[in-house]
Amino acid sequence: LPASSSSTGSAPIRWSGGNDLLRLYLQDIGRVDLLTAEDEVLLSRLVQQYERLKREERHLAEEHPAIERLLCLEELQLREANHLSHWPTRQEWARAAEIPLQELNQAITKGYETWAGLIDSDSRELQRRLREGRKARDRMIQANLRLVVAVAKKYQHRGMELLDLVQEGTLGLERAVEKFDSTRGFRFSTYSYWWIRQGITRAIATQSRTIRLPVHITEKLNRIKRVQQEIASNEGRTASMSDLAKELSVSEDT
């Protein structure tokens, strides 16, 4: 996928390939616990609730200016996150919107209060449900990144480097999380395999080299790139495995 349509967003990056970088990435994702069948049911329900709320927001924004402004500000927040490779603070968000922080806070509050009132809910409860959905979505993605790597390895030597394939497969995984319906009786790994494979094979077919990933994953990967760039700039040398391992808080010998 050359671009992500996810509601949590994505940011463009380029990998500098190499077995060392892949090894560090695998160490990092390997520390995430796998999900039980019960976990999948609970998390998928929260994700589906989140997706319904976001569809509802887009629909209501067509007729309610306060919600439309909230939606525009959220889209700006996402673009800024893509630019910064991390979710912006309220101050960074306000600067990007070119408005005072107080005005930003007021617009967000008014947007949520208007939205909540239209669906007979409470603003705090609405925001809590959205937060739960985002966290559930990220949890499902993080817990299945090892499956992405396993699938990507089957498609090596077809014109794209393994790390690029991993990124494309992650986008397929992201889509699977959005679509998964636990009531159909499938385990998520079975369901997501098709989406992961589709993301990878589509990328191979188009030979796409510019990849987009969810922000929470690019944050992790860009920490490595940042160390490489800082050491090259400040010390005039290439970052060692020890430097990168220290940044990721993993053992160099693991």
Predicted regions and their residues:
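Intrinsic, short, N-terminal disordered tails of RNA polymerase sigma-factor systems
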Residues: 1-3
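Short, contiguous pre-domain boundary segments
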Residues: 5-7
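Alpha-helical promoter-recognition and RNA polymerase-docking modules of transcription initiation factors
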Residues: 9-212, 216-230
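Alpha-helical residues within the helix-turn-helix
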Residues: 95, 242, 246
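Short, charged, surface-exposed loops that flank catalytic or proteolytic processing sites
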Residues: 233-240
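Short, intrinsically disordered, charge-balanced linker/junction segments flanking boundaries
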Residues: 245-254
